Amino acid sequence: MRFAAFILCFLTVFSGKAQYFTVSGYVADSSRSPIPDVSIFITNGSMVGNTDGSGYYKFDLRSGEYEVVFNHPNYQRVSLKVVLDKKDDTLNVILPELAKSVGEIQITRKWTDPGPEMMRKAIEKKDYWASRFPSSSAEVYIRAFEQYNPPKKKENIWHEPDTALENKKKKKNKDDEPNINMAEILLQRDFQPPGKIKEIRTGVKKIGDVSGLFYLSTTEGDFNFYQNLIRIRGIGDMPVMSPLSGTALLAYKFQFLGSYKNDAGQRILKIKMSPRSISNAVFSGEIHLVDTLFYIYRTELNYPVNQLNEYDKFTMRQEFNLSKDSWLTIEKQRFDYHAAAGKGKFSGYTLVKYNKYELNKTFPKNHFGLEVSSATDSAYDRDSAFWSQKRTTPLNNTEIRFITRTDSIKRVQSSKTYLDSIEKDKNKVTFAKLFFKGQEYQNREKGYYMDFQPMMFIVQPWFPGGTRVTLWNTFERRFKNKRDIRLIENLSYGINNKDIRGTVIFTTTFDPFHRGVFSATAGRDFNFINPNAAFLDLARRGNFYQNTHADVYVRRELINGLYLRVQAEFSERKDISNFTFDGFADSLFENNIPTSFRTNRAFFGNFTLSYTPFQKYIREPRQKVILGSRWPTFSINLNHAIPGVMGSNIDYSYLEYRIEQDFPLGLLGRSEYRIVSGSFMRKNNLSPVDFRYQRRGDPSVFTPPMYAFQTLDSTFVTYKRFIEGHFRHHFNGSLINKIPFMRLLKLRESAGANILYAPERRNMLFYEVYGGIDKLIRIWRDRYKLGIYYAVGYSNLFEKPVVGFKLNFEYFDRRNNSW
């Protein structure tokens, strides 16, 4: 025992004397620029280390006293005494420059920015760190805040009485108050590589109009810079190249800005990034890397301005954390954006905080499916106490005042007294409502809502047969489970022909989650013979007929992505050749003659089945939000007319197939296509109402190219199987932005081609190509495209190609993030 104790004591003393300490720091020149490849020696001449490309060094020595020598051939040697006793030491050294003379010429070593080399090392380790995001579950808190700041009004320089001036100041202060919108979301986010996500929202609070708020769900975008491209449809149409992309060194300029230490004592490298060319779809800003490990510690990046759809400026900040087991997790995100609206400005931010991580979590086999997000039944009913407890980031003063004010207003507005007063005001009959706005009536306790047509719209001069006196009203009942019923009546009296017409429509949403809708319609009104006619032909008398009809319609999602639409209709169709017409319409159209056909009756059923495989969606309480799919949508439509039912004499069957898709093509933009093929399987008896028309092009107007041809010379009917195809590619500036200074104009280019094969028209093969440029235009917060296109079409039946310029107009749908 004594011998063992002696050995243990000896080892303890030996281990204490053999204790090592770390010496680290930076070596720079007199301008504080880092010096790489500095040799470091100690007193006995032993070399203990070198500086890296950023001037950083690190080595270990036993406890004791040393003279450390820093040596570089182009700088003066520096020696420092170091005593290592109880802790590590840090030495930051400046080496004076050593000028070498050759005759009267001084030669000094040129400094090379280490930023590109640092990024090269980060790119080399990209795949490794991309694999270090483990399957995990985390609690995520999201707060989105936005305010509209109206333009400041000019002060009145004229003197006014104190009372009037005070009242005006109060009114001005009230008018100048910012319009604020805000949302808070608490959710559990489950993640499994390489990109599977499932959210469960346990708390949702929305105040004001939240349609313009960004990133209310982590499903809205993946800001993973370990991917080559970052695509966020809510921000812009084009993807942006990641600074860690394999070709980033060709597209980005990197500059080393310095370094700092984080709370864990790690050295963080700050690198500035900017585009090498203004035409590149790349970020600008800063990326912070952890030295030697070269994973992303923090980013602060600006989205390229020319790629923004809705915003004028968009900045994203992210912070990451490395666990003890070398697993990467995202810690927080912040998105700041600004957008002009009129003479005012919208500004907002979204804060996303991740905590309570469970790393390497094992999920059930079918946990990650097509439902990527869902909300609990109580998520939208959380009170202030819940949010006070769950907020991971305190509110600022503006947010506190806003929430306090809105909570107080909500308490008042949810009181029976207030609701009764609002209801009474809406139900009050006034001259302005009767003639201009439209009279309302509601009974909120029973869920009744009624709208009556304003009297200023009673006289309508645009109907076939001349001016008509119209009256329409709407009755609606809404239920708490999102179901509703609606009744719409529309009556009219023709002054010229002294006829009464009208329609009654009943609709109900019987299954909100599966978008189940039932509709029943009955009436006697006008309808289009060819509802897809060219714009100039749509309003001609030859495109109208009288329709006395009754029909029922049901549409519902059967399984996810599979929709069935069934319609049954009985109708009597008459032409309008015996009508008395106004001369005003004759001045608008030449040869404005009604189409004549025999009065007929039709009883038919219409069946449409469409399927989008692997359709992703979000589940709201009693509601479903479709996110889309990477797969095409396949559709089949059968229209079958049955003779002999209640005197019906129309007899035909028409079958049509469709396939359509919209898909991205990286930095080249995105493409979309639509292919349609149809034919009459039986056509024993048809009227012009039942024909399948091929639409002619509109002069000077660029018609939506997925549904129409631009240069087809005439409208005609097809009975046999036809095939039409439409393709369009949106370059979204990827070509035109390469021209100097064009990027500032925010132009978007696109091109496409259409084809039609109609065998019964002497084996007609028609094809056309088009291309053009659109200018992005903003009106308030809405975005539009106004452009000019050039189209060239040719057919084996044409003597020469048909060419022409077209004007294009498109609107950006903020709800679906699409044009």
Question: Where on the chain are the PLM-derived regions?
Answer:
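A short, solvent-exposed loop/turn motif at the edges and junctions
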Residues: 67-81
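Hydrophobic beta-strand segments
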Residues: 38-42, 68, 107, 138, ...
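Short, acidic Ser/Thr/Gly-rich low-complexity loop/linker segments typical of extracellular
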Residues: 45-56
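A short, amphipathic beta-strand motif
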Residues: 21-29, 55, 93, 107
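Short, ordered, surface-exposed loop/turn motifs in non-cytosolic proteins
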Residues: 21-23, 29-44, 63
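Exposed, low-structure sequence patches enriched in small/polar residues
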Residues: 239-240, 369-819
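Extracellular beta-sheet/turn segments enriched in Thr/Pro/Gly and aliphatic residues
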Residues: 83-110
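Structured extracytoplasmic
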Residues: 104-268, 274-282, 343-344, 348-460, ...
